Amino acid sequence: MRYSAPTSPCISNGAEIFVQEGAVENPVEVDGTAEPPGNPRVLWISFLAFTLGFAVWGMFSALAPFLIKWYSFSATQVLVLAAVEPLFAAAVSIPLGILTDKFGGRTVFTLLLLSLTVPLFCGLFAQGYYSFLVLGTLLGVGGASFVVGNAHVSSWYPKSKQGTALGIFALGNIGIAVGTVAVTLLITRVLNRTDDWDGWRLIFPIFGIATLLMAMVYWFFTSDSPYKEHKGESVREIVAVYRSGVLVWLVTYLYWASFGTLTFFASAVPTYLLDQWHADAARASMVYAPLLVVCVAITRPLGGWLADRFDALTFLSRLFGIMVVLALVMAMQISLHTELFAIYGLALLSGAAAAAVVKLIPVYFPRQVGAVSGLAKAAGAACGFTMTVTLAVSKDLLGGYTFGFAVWALMNVAAFYITLSRVGFRQPSTEAVPSGQAPDAISVYSNIATPNSARSTLSAR
């Protein structure tokens, strides 16, 4: 079932019915209490928009090696430059998630894409380190596109299929690889300005035009779901989930450790390989960095599919256990080949882990998917900033990267403990629920394998 326009509610025999506005023939009526049937058109357009948003977000990771060459920036300066994008993405993710819950994904995603066009066209005039710092910060909005799309897609799919649908949507992580490869190819092959810092700036309006076209496609070819479970809720009721108990923060931390691998590595790996292992700048941007993003992206649908079918916490504990080992191997810095093995192994595992964590959000918090997704995405993006800065400080103060990667290994140890012990996942949490309504933070005392078990627990109350 597809919808080409927004819907409006009416009352029929005491039930809330949604009638599609603007339809010329065959008006569509939808029982607001029914399970959503899925919407492939919204899924795939959201996937494309998310991919483009992440491509814009990943631009400065690809530019970093060239900026070192053209402007003689230090490795620390470039690491900070690459880190401000995930920092700003973290800052805007929470409000964007709340706005998506309140106003719908179609409107918010369109406005997000339009907001990206402004700094992209202004990129033609950036000069000096601080102007690039401001530009990179504003382009960080692209990193928040996950939050909006995640809430929009999940509202169209039943809980039994949300893991798979959100895993497919999350393939948009590959946008970082698209951005890094596209930027490098445009600079080295199309614009041919590897030794000149003027012509390469055309990459900004090229991405700006693509983003503007995507905004138009999103507005005219997607619609908001009439099945949303939080209709009529105020912003205060939506954000109350942040006070609902420890569960929301545990889920957020797990996303910090899983999705944070992508934001951390995408920001730091090109510069790290260039500085520590003397990798070629073009190779670092066109091969090493995009490949790690591809590794994250390709395992997300598989992780979502497995999370639909097996106990999610057991699955996550095994993933994080292996990630701890690989993070320690990476901290040892034995050789370039060993580092690449650890990097790509972590990328594959973190993609599956992130999909499993995302699956938990609509199961535990069906009425505040946007708000909780925003918090989780903010944590994942903040991890990219925090760990990249930690790596830069480690290099500056200690002369190497070992301490920074050791800190990262400890983050994975904490995630492994949380999922193995299931601490905090056995107690119900109801503070976020408005008066007179059923609880949203679903408690399942020993098994969170499927949404059906979660719904059964809720019904039993």
Regions found by a protein language model. Give the residues of each.
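Cytoplasmic helix-loop-helix junction between adjacent transmembrane helices
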Residues: 135-172
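C-terminal membrane-cytosol helix-exit motif in multi-pass small-molecule transporters
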Residues: 188, 208-229, 415-423
